[in-house]
């Protein structure tokens, strides 16, 4: 039975019939229009309250998940219940009108009495439904019902394509009046209905002063059987389902295919409904919350009661309305009788019908309809209401009977304006503002209280759209504000200044044309140009703005320009204009021709006989000749600059005149225009190709300029980074988009304004760890709150998720216009792409497109790329590069382009498309040009459809959701996939085996990483010397490099690591698809993977953000006892701890890591007693592991995941404890280091064991071990020597070489650090892992720098620079500039100039990787501060020193941090010298504090001996400044001894010079360093031999000691 029903429902005729009443489906009408049919019946009018409020609530919802679908579900939940009741009781739903419906029981007159009883019963049951139904969404849904009975006339009208029907007559008027009298839950009978009904069955209540009555209840006699009574009544209903069909609600559900009937019924249904029925792809396509323009037309007739009379009038009006709407893609949605009149509900902007300038078109149509209908003889009054905004457009009703309708406050406002302001065309303020028409087309009307509309806002009368010359009104619309800068348009103004200069010098005409899309700020540019032009003496700037209407007015542009030139714009009366004109033209034009000017300037010169005989063309020529003479005369007296905004609306005659004008005399014309909608006229083309025309295509604003604009618009000193990213991405650099997004945020009260918090005073918690504000450029401070001395900042309301916000209606409309202009197949492609996300790959798009082949898709994509819907990129690096820079302004040379096309060099459109197809095939990554388009297209899908597509995407992506092939397809969190069952695709055994083989995945009882399966063969001799050890280790690494270079196996990866790209195009989208599918555990898995991956890549901010996403999901999980969830919690805290560690928040980090270990069943002791006990246990375990020769069976994946995570936590814990000075903390640190080793040994994984041994070696060296080689380093080498030279072993060896080199650098064995670092560099360069390779280069550069091996250093810096450019690696570039600053400050030559380094810092200090990377930015700021301190430029010093100070508190035990802090301390020491010299009060205290701080750094376990010489050098300088010669001598000698031991030639040379300087204490002039700086040689001079390295060494800064007498 259900299959049969499905088959019936799928028939086109059944689907069409569902949109129509039985009255039409089974009607037999004559073909003539209008046709009239009369019958008797009972009418029910049901009005449902609450839906309009609900529509308003949903249409203003912030988030994208509160859309049309929820609305349609709730609407139909209620309406379908009413429809079902009506159908069960034999009614026929005639019309749905928004949230009301009209039903008919058509019977013979003698049956009316009984049928009224049935209808009353039906009405009471409808009320009963709403008492029983639960109230949803906080809505109070109630119904009011009116009933009427009697004669009814049906009118059918229309044209050859569309038919409409109306029911008219007294009964129709009565039913509406009855419903209007009803209160909530009332049933009102009209007077005639009360007359005709069976009064004995009905208990009523009288209504004062009315003949209508209110039904209380039915009171049948005791013996009355309603079922029998109902069956008898239904026997008289023609189309009530009975017999075999009694289970059907409607007979029309059973219609057999009938092409003739189908064709006839199609005429009653809107075209977009028929499209949806034909195209099954578009199911649910029409239910939307959509910005539209409503035009409500009401016609009142002279003889209301005569069907024949009003029929012909309605027919005439309908035909005209249809023809007008067709031109502008508007549609009639409903026609019904409304308060004694006939109303047409017309809509512009239905799905698929959105067009540009919709509001203007709607007003044009309204005026046209008004003018026509007012002339129809039988129509007494025409009233039209126009309103714009978001309404619900969708199919409302029941499966078997529904209609496409619009519901919303804007529909109500249009209807109310139409009724309360009769006889005119009215519009609301949104329509008025959005029409872009001059204000003089409108007149504001007095406010009226309108039923059902709380506050409609201002109401305007549209006076007509014929352009009237209102002198003085055509100036540029917007005003220039003195206190507001023109942002991001420096280049555009430069074009003007340059062209202006040419104009003044050559005395030739110049035309400057700015083309840009709407919203690019063209008017703002012209306002600035008008201001600049008027600053010059003897210049006259005439500025006008045109509108769409101007184009249709012949010679309008010249008319307005000439009115301004002649000074008529300031005249208040036509007589004044006439006098002015007479004075100006009397010498140029005979008096008898003055009347030529009557029409054009609205004056009243007497009309001469000669003029009356003159033809129209001759008059125009005379007029043009006169204007030329006037302009020639004016040009002699002053320079004229014509400025025309919206020049695409210049009429053809005006273009022709302008073209002649620029050939005839020197004049400067500046225009702004949107791209021409159609091919411009010949004259416009000629101007564009003129050699004196400069044609500029406006670009967008750059990200920093958008940031500045937002800060200036909001008048704040800073905005949150999240807001900055949202606006930069969402606006795409278009000023209007940025403004609309900001307005939307303000409307939803998302922005909070309060005094900016001082960074150093903020108490750090996890939630504000990355409270990251971005600031405008310094030259913008003048326009923000900073200028007033108040640092007001903008913040976001807590809990808001900007990326999920629904786009503002204004921007949504722009996207809908573009979408609706596409073919249906292209729309489908865009909508499918929107599901994938902002960025997508061609492979995934192809996977989810229904029934497409690759050729079709490539062709469609090429077209969409060509039309700027998508951008395409070859790699994610290209994408990231493009996102940093928006499209800039450029010049178009139309003249040279036209010459090329004449030579046949221009491509045809087909060739261009073919070229684009080739480009799309090469580019696998695409991205929406406008994020708003993606959001808009995404919102068009229904929830179920979204789920299906998200599921498809997830299934496709999860196959690649791991590390890249280069990294052996592993998890970012080791063994993570063993813990959680996150796969959607079920795998058979063959697939599993293939995966094991190709990807390295193994079963749960096996592991991914290599094992220590081979027993140890090699051991170092016990008494081997340090030199022999060194030689053996270096020889081993040399052999490994040779093996890597010469191996025939797949030792060297064919491609470099591209994990970062996978994060963007696979793992992040996959996590988001799972969020959309509400698969929270799977989404959490991938967000944790993302956080871990970004930590590996050094991006703490992104790791924090994705961990935040994960935290939201963790809170939603319910299965708290499961091991997988416990592990996810542990991972979450472990990653939190790592982020806190990287940010220098050690207390928070320790807390998080302890939590993670507790969840992993490895409690870390929290008191000395448990510490002692645990230490004993761990030492025994270590001894057991170290003496264990044979390996037991492999561990399960789940166990390994747990051990790896524990090891990671311990690795961070010992570093945290090492930072603390409390003596017992070193025991905690030692325990953590031993526990890391034990955990790693338990994994039986070589890589993990080697990492732990090297970590423990580092711990011991930093804790004070003084030997060159620690025993665990020897154990590492033994492990390495026993590894087979293949696969992952090379990675382990490269890692070991790098780590050993790093340890040797920290401990001051610089030669050894260089030897090991060089070998690590060679290995990592072969292994093609940029993330590891850059770190090796950074580490290698420092010992080379200290050893003064500049040739090798410069070579390493060259590699580092190449890597930073090819990989777009910001960390490498920042480190490169850090070393360049070091070279200038300490080595005495220039590799890159100070200005270049400073510019890099200015451009990148807000980069999220640098800003949240502990140490590097501190080092850069401190180097700049030291530079300025040496030059005694103290203001600049304070600026950078204060920036560095905020980063000092992020104490992390890393080389970069200590590099940074040592330079920061040098800056403070130089400042102390200034304080002492100026005899500042607190100089002595500052000196003592500084010395303590330096001593603390030296005493710290984690600092590393390599930094001691510099720190002792600074301590010596502080002592000499404070007069403590003895201590100075001690620190100086200690530093020299350490430099000698370590081979630190750089520091040794500087120390020797300082010692010599301080001992001899000669006079030193303040500007000596300035002289040194000015003579610093470049590296090229050194290489060429012009400068020797011995000379370079003398370019050291000598710290001034002329404050005290020589203490020595």
Swiss-Prot record:
Pfam families to which the protein is assigned, alphabetical: Guanylate_cyc
Binding annotation for ATP: 47-52, 99, 144, 406, 412-416
Binding site residues for Mg(2+) 1: 47, 99
Expression sites by tissue: Detected in testis (at protein level). Preferentially expressed in testis.
Membrane topology category: Peripheral membrane protein
Cellular component GO terms, alphabetical: apical part of cell; apical plasma membrane; astrocyte end-foot; axon; basal part of cell; central region of growth cone; cytoplasm; cytosol
Entry note: cofactor: Binds 2 magnesium ions per subunit. Is also active with manganese (in vitro).
Essential cofactor(s): Mg(2+); Mn(2+)
Location of the protein in the cell: Cell membrane; Cytoplasm, Cytoskeleton; Cytoplasm, Perinuclear region; Nucleus
Residue span, Guanylate cyclase domain: 42-179, 293-418
Homology family: Belongs to the adenylyl cyclase class-4/guanylyl cyclase family.
Record-linked PANTHER family: ADENYLATE CYCLASE TYPE 10 (PTHR16305:SF32), TESTICULAR SOLUBLE ADENYLYL CYCLASE (PTHR16305)
Known role: Catalyzes the formation of the signaling molecule cAMP. May function as sensor that mediates responses to changes in cellular bicarbonate and CO(2) levels. Has a critical role in mammalian spermatogenesis by producing the cAMP which regulates cAMP-responsive nuclear factors indispensable for sperm maturation in the epididymis. Induces capacitation, the maturational process that sperm undergo prior to fertilization. Involved in ciliary beat regulation.
Protein name: Adenylate cyclase type 10
Source species: Rattus norvegicus (Rat)
């Amino acid at each position: 039975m259900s299959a049969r029903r499905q088959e019936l429902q799928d028939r086109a005729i059944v689907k069409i019939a569902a949109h129509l009443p039985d009255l039409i489906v089974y009607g037999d009408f004559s073909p003539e229009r209008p046709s009239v049919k009369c019958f008797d019946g009972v009418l029910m009018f049901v009005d449902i309250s609450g839906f309009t409020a609900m529509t308003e609530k949903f249409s203003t919802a912030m988030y994208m998940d509160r859309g049309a679908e929820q609305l349609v579900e709730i609407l139909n939940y209620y309406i379908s219940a009413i429809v079902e009741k009506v159908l069960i009781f034999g009614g026929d739903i005639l019309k749905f009108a928004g949230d009301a419906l009209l039903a008919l029981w058509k019977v013979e007159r003698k049956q009316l009495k009984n049928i009224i009883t049935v209808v009353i019963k039906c009405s009471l049951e409808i009320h009963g439904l709403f008492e029983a139904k639960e109230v949803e969404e906080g809505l109070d849904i109630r119904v009011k019902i009116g009933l009427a009975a009697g004669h009814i006339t049906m009118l059918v009208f229309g044209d050859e394509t569309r038919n409409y029907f109306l029911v008219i007559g007294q009964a129709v008027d009565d039913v509406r009046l009855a419903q209007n009298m009803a209160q909530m839950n009332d049933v009102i009978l009209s007077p005639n209905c009360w007359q005709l009904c069976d009064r004995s069955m009905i208990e009523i209540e009288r209504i004062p002063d009315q003949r209508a009555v209110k039904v209380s209840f039915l009171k049948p006699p005791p013996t009355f059987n309603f079922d029998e009574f109902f069956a008898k009544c239904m026997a008289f209903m023609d189309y009530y389902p009975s017999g075999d069909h009694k289970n059907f609600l409607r007979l029309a559900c059973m219609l057999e295919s009938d092409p003739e009937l189908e064709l006839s019924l199609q005429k009653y249904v809107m075209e977009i409904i028929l499209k949806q029925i034909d195209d099954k792809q578009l199911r649910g396509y029409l239910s939307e919350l959509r910005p539209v323009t409503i035009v409500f037309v009401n016609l009142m007739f002279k003889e209301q009661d005569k069907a024949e009379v009003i029929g012909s009038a309605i027919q005439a009006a309908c035909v005209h309305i249809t023809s007008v709407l067709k031109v502008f893609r508007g549609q009639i949605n409903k026609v019904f009788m409304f308060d004694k009149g006939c109303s047409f509900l017309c809509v512009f902007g239905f799905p698929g019908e959105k067009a540009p300038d919709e509001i203007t078109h709607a007003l044009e149509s309204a005026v046209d309809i008004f003018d026509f209908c007012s002339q129809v003889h039988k129509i007494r009054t025409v009233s039209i209401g126009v309103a714009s905004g978001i309404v619900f457009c969708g199919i409302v009703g029941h499966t078997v009977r529904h209609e496409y309708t619009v519901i919303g406050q804007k529909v109500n406002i249009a209807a109310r304006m139409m009724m309360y302001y009769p006889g005119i065309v009215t519009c609301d303020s949104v329509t008025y503002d959005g029409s872009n028409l001059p204000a003089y087309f409108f007149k504001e009307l007095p406010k009226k209280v309108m039923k059902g509309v709380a506050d409609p806002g201002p109401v305007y009368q549209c006076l007509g759209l014929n352009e009237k010359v209102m002198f003085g009104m055509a100036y540029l619309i917007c005003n220039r504000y003195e206190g507001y800068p023109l942002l991001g348009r420096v280049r555009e103004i430069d074009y003007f200044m340059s062209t202006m200069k040419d104009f003044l010098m050559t005395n030739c005409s110049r035309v400057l044309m700015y083309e840009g899309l709407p919203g690019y700020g063209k008017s703002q540019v012209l306002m600035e140009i008008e201001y600049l032009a008027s600053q010059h003496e003897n210049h006259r700037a005439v500025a006008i703005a045109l509108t769409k209407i101007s184009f249709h007015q012949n010679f309008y542009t010249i008319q307005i320009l000439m009115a301004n030139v002649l000074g008529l714009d300031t005249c208040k009366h036509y007589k004044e204009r006439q006098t002015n004109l007479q004075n100006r033209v009397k010498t140029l034009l005979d008096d008898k021709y003055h009347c030529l000017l009557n029409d054009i300037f609205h004056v009243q010169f007497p009309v001469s006989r000669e003029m009356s005989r003159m033809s129209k063309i001759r008059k125009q020529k005379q007029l043009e000749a006169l204007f030329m003479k006037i302009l020639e005369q004016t040009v002699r007296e002053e320079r004229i600059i014509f400025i025309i905004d919206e020049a695409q609306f210049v009429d053809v005659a005006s273009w022709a005149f302008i073209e002649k004008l620029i050939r005839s005399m020197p004049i400067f014309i500046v225009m702004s225009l949107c791209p021409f909608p159609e091919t411009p006229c010949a004259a416009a083309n000629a101007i564009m190709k003129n050699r004196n025309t400069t044609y500029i295509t406006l670009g967008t604003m750059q990200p920093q300029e958008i940031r500045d604009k937002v800060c200036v618009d909001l008048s704040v000193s800073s905005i949150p980074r999240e807001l900055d990213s949202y606006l930069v991405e969402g606006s795409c650099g278009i000023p209007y988009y940025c403004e609309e997004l900001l307005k939307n945020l303000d409307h939803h009260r998302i922005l909070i304004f309060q005094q900016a918090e001082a960074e150093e005073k903020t108490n750090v918690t996890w939630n504000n760890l990355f409270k990251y504000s971005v600031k405008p450029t310094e030259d913008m401070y003048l326009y923000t709150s900073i200028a007033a001395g108040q640092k007001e900042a903008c913040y976001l309301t807590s809990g808001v998720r900007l990326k999920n916000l629904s786009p503002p209606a204004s921007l949504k409309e722009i996207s809908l216009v573009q979408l609706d202009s596409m073919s249906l197949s292209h729309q489908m492609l865009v909508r499918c792409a929107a599901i994938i996300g902002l960025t997508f790959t061609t492979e995934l798009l192809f996977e989810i497109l229904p029934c497409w082949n690759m050729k079709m898709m490539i062709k469609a994509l090429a077209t969409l790329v060509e039309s700027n819907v998508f951008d395409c990129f070859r790699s994610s690096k290209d994408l990231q590069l493009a996102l940093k820079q928006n499209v800039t302004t450029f010049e178009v040379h139309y003249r040279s382009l036209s010459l090329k096309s004449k030579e046949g060099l221009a491509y045809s459109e087909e060739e261009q498309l073919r070229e684009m197809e080739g480009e799309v095939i090469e580019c696998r990554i695409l991205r929406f040009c406008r994020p708003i388009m993606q959001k808009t297209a995404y919102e068009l899908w229904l929830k179920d459809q979204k789920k299906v597509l998200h599921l498809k995407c997830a299934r496709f992506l999860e196959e690649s959701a791991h590390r890249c092939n280069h990294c052996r397809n592993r998890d970012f969190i080791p063994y993570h996939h063993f813990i959680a069952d996150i796969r959607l695709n079920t795998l058979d055994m063959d697939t599993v085996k293939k995966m094991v083989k190709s990807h390295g995945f193994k079963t749960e009882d096996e592991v991914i990483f290599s094992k220590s399966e081979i027993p140890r063969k090699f051991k170092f001799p016990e008494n081997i010397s340090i030199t022999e050890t060194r030689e053996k280790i270096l020889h081993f690494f040399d052999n490994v490099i040779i093996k890597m270079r010469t191996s025939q196996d797949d030792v060297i990866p064919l491609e470099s690591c591209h994990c970062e790209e996978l994060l963007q195009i696979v793992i992040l989208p996959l996590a988001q698809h799972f969020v959309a599918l509400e698969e929270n555990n799977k989404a959490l898995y991938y967000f944790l993977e993302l956080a871990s991956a970004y930590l590996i890549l050094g991006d703490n901010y992104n790791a924090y953000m994705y961990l935040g996403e994960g935290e939201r999901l963790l809170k939603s999980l319910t299965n708290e006892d499961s091991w997988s969830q416990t592990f996810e919690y542990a991972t979450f805290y472990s990653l939190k701890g790592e982020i806190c560690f990287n940010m220098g928040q050690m207390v928070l980090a320790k807390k998080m890591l302890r939590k993670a270990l507790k969840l992993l069943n490895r409690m870390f002791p929290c008191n000395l007693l448990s510490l002692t006990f645990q230490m004993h246990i761990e030492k025994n375990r270590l001894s057991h592991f170290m003496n264990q020769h044979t390996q037991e069976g492999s561990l399960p994946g789940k166990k390994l995941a747990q051990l790896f995570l524990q090891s990671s936590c311990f690795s961070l814990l010992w570093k945290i404890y090492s930072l603390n000075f409390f003596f017992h903390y070193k025991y905690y640190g030692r325990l953590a280091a031993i526990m890391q080793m034990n955990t790693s040994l338990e994994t039986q994984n070589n890589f993990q064991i080697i990492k732990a041994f090297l970590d423990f070696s580092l711990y011991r060296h930093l804790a004070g071990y003084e030997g060159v080689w620690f025993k665990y380093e020897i154990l590492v080498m033994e492990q390495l020597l026993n590894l087979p030279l293949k696969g992952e072993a090379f990675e382990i060896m490269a890692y070991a070489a790098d780590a050993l080199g790093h340890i040797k650098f920290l401990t001051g064995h610089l030669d050894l650090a260089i030897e090991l670092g060089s070998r690590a560099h060679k290995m990592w360069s072969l292994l093609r892992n940029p993330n590891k390779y850059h770190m090796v280069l950074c580490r290698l550069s420092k010992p080379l720098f200290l050893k003064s091996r500049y040739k090798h250093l410069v070579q390493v810096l060259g590699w580092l620079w190449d890597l930073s450019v090819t990989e777009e690696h910001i960390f490498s570039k920042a480190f490169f500039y850090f070393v360049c600053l070091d070279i200038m400050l300490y080595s005495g030559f220039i590799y890159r100039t100070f200005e270049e380094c400073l510019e890099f810092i200015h451009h990148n200090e807000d980069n999220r990787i640098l800003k949240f990377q502990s140490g590097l930015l501190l080092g850069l700021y401190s180097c700049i501060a030291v530079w300025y301190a040496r030059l005694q430029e103290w203001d600049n010093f304070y600026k950078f020193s204060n920036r560095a100070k905020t980063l000092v508190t992020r104490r992390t035990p890393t080389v970069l941090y200590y590099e940074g802090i040592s330079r920061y301390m040098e800056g403070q020491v130089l400042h102390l010298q200034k304080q002492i010299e100026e005899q500042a009060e607190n100089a002595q205290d500052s000196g003592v504090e500084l010395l303590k701080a330096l001593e603390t750094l030296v005493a710290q376990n984690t600092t590393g001996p390599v930094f001691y010489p510099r720190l002792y050098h600074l301590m010596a300088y502080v002592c000499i400044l404070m007069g403590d010669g003895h201590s100075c001598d001690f620190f100086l000698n200690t530093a020299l001894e350490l430099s000698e031991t370590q081979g630190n030639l750089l520091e040794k040379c500087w120390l020797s010079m300082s010692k010599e300087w301080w001992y001899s204490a000669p006079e030193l002039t303040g500007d000596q360093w300035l002289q040194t700086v000015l003579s610093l040689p470049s590296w090229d001079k050194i290489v060429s031999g012009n400068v020797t390295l011995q000379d370079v060494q003398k370019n050291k800064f000598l710290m001034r000691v002329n404050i005290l007498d020589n203490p020595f």
